[in-house]
Structure formats: structure tokens, C-alpha cells
């Protein structure tokens, strides 16, 4: 199949985990009714974003949140990218995205590789590494439509990850992410367009809706960018479902017109992956 419908759920996240899960599943069902084949939730869809919240909201996989995601994926026969949740495993915490297939089975689990440790004086200081551990693996999954590569938020800043995914046959990269009011206006769309053009892939980002009262205010603006670098659709700041019909014929045409993937100079440079 050369076309499919992608849905990004820009969820308004509250401090009540059960409400977040229930609302997320409701919006997933709505997206499926509108013909979505692949649906993505945002980063930290079941909890507020913050190092003080991660230990409190963390759960094992499978657990409360992922069991519900499995059920709703199977109920609606869709591929569901479960945004991310704080995951507890063997005494460590991770920022983890679980993906479920139309049969409800877990396809892959991506743990955020690059932790969000930044300091922009006078604007924002954040250190995920205070409570989280980094993942150490690449994460892709196959659908009847295309191969999908996964990253979470800060992972998008690292071009090497996207390059490796493209080399491994991914045609769509999905980054559940929660950029903030400093980095969002500066880099959110820029990075998506860069990753799309550099690798001639579709790039999609699913953000939480903006909550001005939250301790961490998300930028919002979930987005889909095509391999030409064109923004196909972009949300505002409120809770919504963003739809985009992905055309893989267009991707093939762009790769034929500007064949950069075949023109790379492996005799001069390379991006090396140290793990499978």
C-alpha cells in the first residue's frame, strides 16, 4: 500500500494518571474511526513532564498504561505508538515508548536514548538524568505500509539516529516530544524539516497540548513534514487530533529526483552504528 493515514494525538495531560489513560484511549478510538492506520500519542502522555513526577508515575511494562494501549490497538486494528511513559525496570527509570500492533501485541519498546540535560541561562534548566537512565538501542517496526523509526523528543536533535534509521529502510520517523517555550519556537519545526530533508523521509512529532499552568509548559504544534521538507499539517496549542495522509509514491519520486542516499561518499565518511 502506497498511502496510509497517520494520526497524532495532541493530548491535554493532567496530574491524574487514570484520566490521562482514559482520555488517550478515547482519542485513539476517534482517530481510528476517522480512518487512521497508525496513531501516535505524545511524550509523557500519562503523567506531567518533570523529574519530580517520573518516580511517582513510573510503571513496569506491561503495566496499567500499556495494557490499555494494547487493548485499544487490538480493538481498533491499528498500529499504536504509545507516546512515552516513565518506565521502571530493575530499579532504573526510563522514558519509554511502547508500540502495539493491530493484534495488540507489543512490537517494540524504545527507551529515550539522549537525555534532556540543558541549561539556557535565564530561560530553562532541565536535567532528565537526575532520575532517568538512557536507552541504548535503535527501535524500528514494520507495517504493511512502511518501516517506522522511533525517537523521543531530544533524540530528534541527533542527526545520526535519523541517518541510521534511513539506512535501515525507514520511510517514516516518529518522535513523540514535548519541546518547551524556549526551544519550541526556535527549533521544533526546524529540526523536523532538517531530519526529513537530510534523509528523504516523512517526519512526525506528537506533542502534549499546551498547559500554561503546568510546571513544564509544552510548545504543542504536533507536526507532519514530508521528504521535501514541506510542512503538511501542524496543530495549534490545544488538544486535538492531527491527521495526515502519507503518500509513499511521493517519497520514491523525491529519492529518484535527488538521489542523495545513493550519492553518499562512503570512501570519505560514514555514520557507524555500534549496536544492531
Swiss-Prot record:
GO molecular function: 2-oxoglutaramate amidase activity; omega-amidase activity
Gene Ontology BP terms: asparagine metabolic process; glutamine metabolic process; oxaloacetate metabolic process
Active-site residue numbers: 43, 112, 153
Keyword Cytoplasm: yes
Modified residues (N6-succinyllysine): 68, 123, 130
EC number(s) from the headed UniProt entry: 3.5.1.3
Reactions performed catalytically: a monoamide of a dicarboxylate + H2O = a dicarboxylate + NH4(+); 2-oxoglutaramate + H2O = 2-oxoglutarate + NH4(+); 2-oxosuccinamate + H2O = oxaloacetate + NH4(+)
Enzyme class: hydrolase
Modified residues (N6-acetyllysine): 68
Organism domain of life: Eukaryota
Assigned keywords, A-Z: Acetylation, Cytoplasm, Hydrolase, Phosphoprotein
Official protein name in the record: Omega-amidase NIT2
The organism of origin for this protein: Rattus norvegicus
Source organism phylogeny: Eukaryota, Metazoa, Chordata, Craniata, Vertebrata
Amino acid at each position: 500500500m502506497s498511502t496510509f493515514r497517520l494520526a497524532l494525538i495532541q493530548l491535554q495531560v493532567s496530574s491524574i494518571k487514570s484520566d490521562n489513560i482514559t482520555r488517550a484511549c478515547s482519542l485513539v478510538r476517534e482517530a481510528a474511526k476517522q480512518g487512521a492506520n497508525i496513531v501516535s500519542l505524545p511524550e509523557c502522555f500519562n503523567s506531567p513532564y518533570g523529574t519530580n513526577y517520573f518516580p511517582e508515575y513510573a510503571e513496569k511494562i506491561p503495566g496499567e498504561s500499556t495494557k490499555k494501549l494494547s487493548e485499544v490497538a487490538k480493538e481498533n486494528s491499528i498500529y499504536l505508538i504509545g507516546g512515552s511513559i516513565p518506565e521502571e525496570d530493575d530499579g532504573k527509570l526510563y522514558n519509554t515508548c511502547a508500540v502495539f500492533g493491530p493484534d495488540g501485541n507489543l512490537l517494540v519498546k524504545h527507551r529515550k536514548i539522549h537525555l534532556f540535560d540543558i541549561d539556557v541561562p535565564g530561560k530553562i534548566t532541565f536535567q532528565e538524568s537526575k532520575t532517568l537512565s538512557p536507552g541504548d538501542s535503535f527501535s524500528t517496526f514494520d507495517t504493511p505500509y512502511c518501516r517506522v523509526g522511533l525517537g523521543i523528543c531530544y533524540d530528534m536533535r541527533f542527526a545520526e539516529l535519523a541517518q541510521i534509521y534511513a539506512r535501515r529502510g525507514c520511510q517514516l520517523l516518529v518522535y513523540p516530544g514535548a519541546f518547551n517555550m524556549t526551544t519550541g519556537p526556535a527549533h521544533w519545526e526546524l529540526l523536523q524539516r532538517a531530519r526529513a530533508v537530510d534523509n528523504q523521509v516523512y517526519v512526525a512529532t506528537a506533542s502534549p497540548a499546551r498547559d500554561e499552568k503546568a510546571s513544564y509548559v509544552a510548545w504543542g504544534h504536533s507536526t507532519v513534514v514530508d521528504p521535501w521538507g514541506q510542512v503538511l499539517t501542524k496543530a495549534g496549542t490545544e488538544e486535538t487530533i492531527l491527521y495526515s495522509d502519507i503518500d509513499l509514491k511521493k517519497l520514491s519520486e523525491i529519492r529518484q529526483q535527488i538521489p542523495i542516499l545513493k550519492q553518499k561518499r562512503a570512501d570519505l565518511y560514514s555514520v557507524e552504528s555500534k549496536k544492531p
